[in-house]
């Protein structure tokens, strides 16, 4: 498992005093209210202020006090230590932990490994890459078991839920 989790990306400056506009890469952008520190380019930096504007976070970090300093950080990802992450409910996982898991069905067929998780309004979808690319809807009647220790996800055979042309 990854020790650091990406929570946002600096996309622009905000004002003249070093504030930065951040695109949140987390389901609940209000989680920034609880961050004391972020990891920026490998360094742990104290969060001095958090504001919200539309669907973006305005972040003030210690030691970044001018627009020029903030400008240099555009396109940089913000990370947090796993121990500072929100607590997940049972059967919830961080996407970074699912990527690379092997997907097999109950008949032993191996589809490949999860390349990414696509978040849709109704349910997540595993993007599985193997001999063929397969999109697996993350629904209880399709995804039967997730074993994070073995990085193995078991699903129903695709013929039971996927229609082929």
UniProtKB/Swiss-Prot annotation:
Q: Which Gene3D superfamilies does this one have?
A: PRC-barrel domain, RimM
Q: Which Pfam families match?
A: PRC, RimM
Q: Where in the cell is it found?
A: Cytoplasm
The Swiss-Prot or TrEMBL record annotates one GO molecular function as:
ribosome binding
Gene Ontology biological-process entries = ribosomal small subunit biogenesis; rRNA processing
Any signal peptide, and if so, which residues? none
Disulfide cross-links: none
- InterPro entries found in the cross-reference section: PRC-brl_dom, PRC_barrel-like_sf, RimM, RimM_N, RimM_N_sf, Transl_B-barrel_sf
Principal location class? cytoplasm
Known role = An accessory protein needed during the final step in the assembly of 30S ribosomal subunit, possibly for assembly of the head region. Essential for efficient processing of 16S rRNA. May be needed both before and after RbfA during the maturation of 16S rRNA. It has affinity for free ribosomal 30S subunits but not for 70S ribosomes.
Regarding protein family, the annotation reads: Belongs to the RimM family.
What is recorded about the protein's domains?
The PRC barrel domain binds ribosomal protein uS19.
Entry protein name: Ribosome maturation factor RimM
Origin species, per record, is Clostridium perfringens (strain SM101 / Type A)
Its ancestry begins with:
Bacteria, Bacillati, Bacillota, Clostridia, Eubacteriales
């Amino acid at each position: 498992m990854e020790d650091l989790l990406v929570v946002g990306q600096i996309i622009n400056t905000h004002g003249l005093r070093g504030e930065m506009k951040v695109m949140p890469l987390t389901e609940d952008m209000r989680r920034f209210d609880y961050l004391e520190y972020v990891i920026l380019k490998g360094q742990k930096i104290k969060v001095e202020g958090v504001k919200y504007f539309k669907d973006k976070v305005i972040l003030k970090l210690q030691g970044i006090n001018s627009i020029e300093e903030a400008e240099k950080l555009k396109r940089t990802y913000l990370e947090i230590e796993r121990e500072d992450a929100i607590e997940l409910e049972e059967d919830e996982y961080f996407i970074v932990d699912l990527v690379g898991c092997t997907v097999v069905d109950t008949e032993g067929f191996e589809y490949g490994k999860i390349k990414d998780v696509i978040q849709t309004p109704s349910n997540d979808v595993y993007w599985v890459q193997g001999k063929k690319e397969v999109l697996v809807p993350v629904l209880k009647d399709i995804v039967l078991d997730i074993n994070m220790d073995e990085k193995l996800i078991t699903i129903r055979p695709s013929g039971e839920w996927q229609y082929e042309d």
